[in-house]
Amino acid sequence: YTSPEFQPCSETFSEKYAFVGPSIRSANEEIEKKRDKLIYISMGTVNNDMMPFYKACISALRDTDYQVIMSVGNLVSIEDFGELPENISVYSHVDQIAVLKKADVFVSHCGMNSVSESLYFEVPLVMLPQTSEQKGVAERVSQLGAGIKVDKLDGVSVMTAINKILSI
């Protein structure tokens, strides 16, 4: 489920192959956008035990005018975040489609489904790939000009990339 624009060397595939694009389901709920800019942070559903990274993002984004929605999975406890700033919400899971329909930037691990959904809704990415597949996906997104790859898992690097995207 990809497009010829996203598939590297798509011109080398024969007519036996059909590029049908991503399969995007409908949103199951509506997300309220409370501020001018909505930042969505999710590092996927498998390798997301990243409490230091999440806390660094909270520290970097706490005093901004951005609304931040973080989906952190079940490997970290929401209670361990303590009191959160008014502009930041943390959940174990969210309806990603509903959030992406309103998001201005998606901070992502670059899983193929997440990237496909982000591109479908025209949400630029701040990319923090963790696996070789995700690194390949991030490279293609960078080539297409649809996101910025960040090499360091820290809040300052993420915030710098977010600000760069929003200033374009």
Predicted regions and their residues:
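Donor-nucleotide binding loops and adjacent catalytic segments primarily
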Residues: F6-V105
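Nucleotide-activated sugar donor-binding and catalytic core shared by glycosyltransferases
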Residues: T2, Q7, C57, I78-I168
